[in-house]
Amino acid sequence: MAGEHVILLDEQDQPAGMLEKYAAHTFDTPLHLAFSCWLFNQQGQLLVTRRSLGKKAWPGVWTNSVCGHPQQGETFEQAVTRRCRFELGVEISDIAPVHPAFRYRAVAPNGIVENEVCPVYAARVVSEVQPNDDEVMDYQWVDLATMLSALAATPWAFSPWMVLEAENRDARQALTDFVARLRG
């Protein structure tokens, strides 16, 4: 999206400025604010996406449903909704935090660094998926338990943030509970 920025953070995770999103993601990416969201359908299936080959970091890699950066003055819920519409063309509901304190740093094979305070959410998809080809090259609906097993068995096949999010016991439980509520 044109004109997007990242909110830079100091080591106490407090806002310390802003930087244009594309310029922020480099070989020495500063700590900044982001979010990650795992989307589910009414049957409790997880939407996994394959990042477009045009992405600067981890192109072509399978990952959780959607990630992004809140803009100044925007709540996380507003940011999640905005990116779901932009990347996947979907409307969502029931946004819930599953790992609010997630923070990670990872280096892509091309040297680009992710360095984020990145609260993790779950949400329910309430419309058909219409992916933006600039963001997503493929997608699949999968069973959460199957995906968690795949992440544990073959972590190299997925984005590092998805693997790290799934390694957190409380986040796994929150995702499992979210799916149970959807299935009623």
Curated annotation (Swiss-Prot):
Binds 1 Mg(2+) ion per subunit. The magnesium ion binds only when substrate is bound. Binds 1 Mn(2+) ion per subunit. The keyword Magnesium applies. Its EC number is 5.3.3.2. Residues 30-164 form the Nudix hydrolase domain. GO terms for biological process: dimethylallyl diphosphate biosynthetic process; isoprenoid biosynthetic process. The keyword Cytoplasm applies. Pfam families: NUDIX. GO terms for cellular component: cytoplasm. InterPro entries: Idi_bact, IsopentenylPP_isomerase_typ1, NUDIX_hydrolase-like_dom_sf, NUDIX_hydrolase_dom. The active site is at residues 67, 116. Keywords: Cytoplasm, Isomerase, Isoprene biosynthesis, Magnesium, Manganese, Metal-binding. GO terms for molecular function: isopentenyl-diphosphate delta-isomerase activity; metal ion binding. Catalyzes the 1,3-allylic rearrangement of the homoallylic substrate isopentenyl (IPP) to its highly electrophilic allylic isomer, dimethylallyl diphosphate (DMAPP). This is Isopentenyl-diphosphate Delta-isomerase. It comes from Klebsiella pneumoniae subsp. pneumoniae (strain ATCC 700721 / MGH 78578).
